[in-house]
Amino acid sequence: MRIYPAIDLMGGKAVRLYRGQKEKVKVYGDPVEIASRFTELVDKIHVVDLDGAFTGKPQNLDVVKEIIEETGLKVQVGGGFRSYESIAKAYEIGAENVIIGTKAFDLEFLEKITDNFDGITVSLDARGGKIAVKGWLEESSLKVGEAYEMLREYVDRFIYTSIERDGTLTGIESIERFWKDEEFIYAGGVSSVDDVLKLRRVGFSGAIVGKALYESEVSLKELLEVLEC
């Protein structure tokens, strides 16, 4: 199991939102400097372009490029990737994985990008067990398991985000495994060693950790050490 430190970008800065609400934002500073803190412990991080998620088009790829070039870290990046051109640009600047959410349910588009790019990752963002789209602003009628069954023939790498938990430090929901052999990464309120161990028991291949690291609720070193046991 892997730990992916998270950096959320807004206006070129590293920020965190409370439950995905852009009105409730806390600024943490220079994203390149923050990314550099992780280089001794991990080789890959999770980056979300929040401006892109809300506008439908990536706005901070220059910052993502700088992170990659300055730190040497591998990056999985999401936020507003709803066109072939924006996805191509992300790979061009050095991203290892591009995360798509809203456009994943356009199966013709999904087939096209998975035919042309490796590492496409689908984010299943859930509120109340239902998939949320367009920067979490709209809720669909699809349940998470239904969305997974629809998309699994196209991709083998997923991120499951519990929106209610995102950035709230309240721990994880009770989740039963519904996926099979795919790489499944969890995001949303991971804030303790116990959370990470529970996710590993369920069968998640990774956990994305953001606010808990910034607020010193848990250290990256602690999480990595317990996973070695």
Curated annotation (Swiss-Prot):
Sorted UniProt keywords: Amino-acid biosynthesis, Cytoplasm, Histidine biosynthesis, Isomerase
Residues of the active site: 8, 125
Pfam family name, one: His_biosynth
Enzyme Commission identifier(s): 5.3.1.16
InterPro entries, per database record: Aldolase_TIM, His_biosynth, HisA_bact_arch, Isoase_HisA-like, Isoase_HisA-like_bact, RibuloseP-bd_barrel
UniProt similarity note: Belongs to the HisA/HisF family.
The protein's name: 1-(5-phosphoribosyl)-5-[(5-phosphoribosylamino)methylideneamino] imidazole-4-carboxamide isomerase
Provenance organism: Thermococcus onnurineus (strain NA1)
